[in-house]
Amino acid sequence: MSATPTPSDYLLLIRNNSWYQALTPSEIEEAMTRFTAWFEELNREGKVKSAAPLAAAGKTITSHTVTDGPFAESKEAIAGFFVVEAESLDEAVEIAKACPGLELGQTVEVRAFAVDPFENEKARITAAH
């Protein structure tokens, strides 16, 4: 991914890193085959700019502490991400709706990148004056 996201870049956050726990090994293998096929199709279409699974464990940092984390329920924990290129938020949502993980209890959050990270704050200040 380029250092600066473009207006056509969208982040897909895949949540629920315990989706496989109730599945048999063959069901997990089948699910991974479907996920791989979906990912490869997005690559062929030139939609994927970046993607990676995340480790289950990490650290949570506040202004004064560093603790083991995340502490969110496993169904809320971020399992991985995709950065996709799409013409619109609606197209990015359609890409997300095809994620095979949805059938397994995962959720996908779709977010546009803020091209100007302070855009909302500037608008609020301008509106106040």
Regions found by a protein language model. Give the residues of each.
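Conserved, structured core segments of small domains
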Residues: 1-129
